[in-house]
């Protein structure tokens, strides 16, 4: 039910969910079962769920992968962005994503229509729904779309929180929703503390564990801008003193 052109791009997103679940040295990952309200471990090829954690890769520091979703990067910045992206990704990340080092198609900027189409396409393939969010998984998604679709990864960012995090790029239909994760076993030496169910809250400045949720209404309502215009700075249309005061009141750093 995506927009026209989705069928032509059905092949690239095949296996995206498996790549997001896959971690270096492990064959499983985790997602949140909203029906059962519990963590499920997906074992590749087994089709079974287990209430046991698996391990995720190293934590990606917030701010290392900077996005500017409210504007398209200038043509001259594409080269520097590409170099930054390659510098940020190590060999383990390339193995994890499983896509070519060189993009299959020419690089292009994300657009509203492209974001909307890719959102529906990923939903049809079950790529993000219920997956725990982490900085590393966001990188995997960015790299995957760049290599397969040529989409420069200077677009994927969300509102600061706490609570539901709305995408700042209008047309991207995936938001981040906080969930409660049982903490029993956290103090056990055998408990895997580097699973995304555990590390997501450490990546988040508010200590919340987040999962991706598809929201088709985001195609028509720019919730990020409506609810939090101050996060867009000078692009918000607010007086500078006002948007800075709002950011300061929410504890969000600004320059």
UniProtKB/Swiss-Prot annotation:
Pfam families: F-protein (PF00469). Residues 139-155 are annotated as: Mediates dimerization. InterPro entries: HIV-1_Nef_core_sf, HIV_Nef. The keyword S-adenosyl-L-methionine does not apply. It is a lipid-anchor. Residues 1-100 are annotated as: Disordered. A lipid is attached at residue 2 (N-myristoyl glycine). Keywords: AIDS, Host cell membrane, Host membrane, Host-virus interaction, Lipoprotein, Membrane, Myristate, Viral immunoevasion, Virulence. GO terms for molecular function: GTP binding. It is found in: Host cell membrane. A motif (PxxP) lies at residues 103-106. Residues 40-53 have a biased composition (Polar residues). SUPFAM superfamilies: Regulatory factor Nef. Residues 87-95 are annotated as: Acidic. Residues 8-20 have a biased composition (Basic and acidic residues). One of its GO terms (cellular component) is host cell plasma membrane. Belongs to the lentivirus primate group Nef protein family. Homodimer. Interacts with host CD247/TCRZ; this interaction induces down-regulation of cell surface TCR/CD3 complexes. Factor of infectivity and pathogenicity, required for optimal virus replication. Alters numerous pathways of T-lymphocyte function and down-regulates immunity surface molecules in order to evade host defense and increase viral infectivity. Alters the functionality of other immunity cells, like dendritic cells, monocytes/macrophages and NK cells. One of the earliest and most abundantly expressed viral proteins. The N-terminal domain is composed of the N-myristoyl glycine and of a cluster of positively charged amino acids. It is required for inner plasma membrane targeting of Nef and virion incorporation, and thereby for infectivity. This is Protein Nef. The lineage of its organism: Viruses, Riboviria, Pararnavirae, Artverviricota, Revtraviricetes. The gene is nef.
